[in-house]
Amino acid sequence: MAWRDRRGALRAILTGSACVRPASVYDAISIRIADDLGFPFGMFGGSVASLAILGDPDIALITLTELAEQVRRMSRAAALPVVVDADHGYGNALNVRRTVEELEAAGAAGLTIEDTLLPQAYGEAKPQLVSREEGLGKITAALDARRDPNLVIIGRTGACSITSLDDAIERALAYQAAGVDALFFTGVKTRAQLEAISAATTLPIALGSPPAELGDFDHLAERRVRIAVQGHAPIAAATEAVFKTLSAIKDGAAPKALTGLASAELMDKVTRADVVAERGEHFLGVKR
């Protein structure tokens, strides 16, 4: 599927009437599994990127080059649209332009730019936000950098949990007026907060890790929520599986005694072994 088609598929979700769950993806295998299972799109979160690329916690240590290369690998591996958490855009508004250019070229279907002050400021234990003016400048730069008009650019704010609901709405309205395609809110905890956001804005809404009170997807859809990101369990599950397997091997377990391993059939499927074999037969004269 061409980049334009993937981006069009993501836009169709935003303009639709349902609230969907994206798959948390982080590498070529995870995105292929998500694609095979029929997820509508994948979400490549910033915390997951830090884990997958560096093995570090989510403290803004990865570089744009590292992020874009991982997105490129995933985009090559499967046709599933990917929304990339581009964090703060890796610097000021000029850096944001470069971030959009690189992620668009890497095949991202969409990306989020947030207003969190990153990396963590000296002496500040709690998360901080950039000013409304700086946040808007980053969003404006992101929109200006876009070359494919189908690329989805989502303005993200963490103000609900850092400053106030009113501040979150004001920031969102500024991003909406600038021309973003959707609004991403983290820290929304109650139906009352969502009602206020939905009433004040007109764009499709994305929520980060909504709590149980916001677990009714029909209710979310009625409030224009089109995306509900529900954490990043796959990489945590994979980490646990690797830990258990290596622990068993270290303790002397025989290979045939190991449990929880992917079957040969599943490995062939996710590696697209049949496609590779067909190409080998066609181009190398290798009989299957």
From Swiss-Prot:
Pfam families linked to this entry? PEP_mutase
Q: Which residues form the signal peptide?
A: none
Top-level taxon in the UniProt lineage: Bacteria
Query: Which cofactor(s) does the record list?
Result: Mg(2+)
Q: So where does Mg(2+) get bound?
A: D85
Alphabetized UniProt keyword annotations: Decarboxylase, Lyase, Magnesium, Metal-binding
The EC number(s) given in the record are 4.1.1.112
GO process annotations (BP)? oxaloacetate metabolic process; propionate catabolic process, 2-methylcitrate cycle; pyruvate biosynthetic process
Enzyme's top EC category = lyase
Locate the residues binding substrate.
S47, R156, H232
For the keyword Lyase, the answer is yes
**What GO molecular function annotations does the UniProt record carry, in alphabetical order?**
magnesium ion binding; methylisocitrate lyase activity; oxaloacetate decarboxylase activity
- Cofactor: record remark: Binds 1 Mg(2+) ion per subunit.
Q: Which reaction does it catalyse?
A: oxaloacetate + H(+) = pyruvate + CO2
What the protein does comes down to: Catalyzes the decarboxylation of oxaloacetate into pyruvate. Seems to play a role in maintaining cellular concentrations of bicarbonate and pyruvate.
Q: How does it assemble?
A: Homotetramer; dimer of dimers.
Q: Entry's PANTHER family? A: OXALOACETATE DECARBOXYLASE, PHOSPHOENOLPYRUVATE CARBOXYLASE
Q: Which family does it belong to?
A: Belongs to the isocitrate lyase/PEP mutase superfamily. Oxaloacetate decarboxylase family.
Full protein name:
Oxaloacetate decarboxylase
Species this chain originates from: Rhodopseudomonas palustris (strain TIE-1)
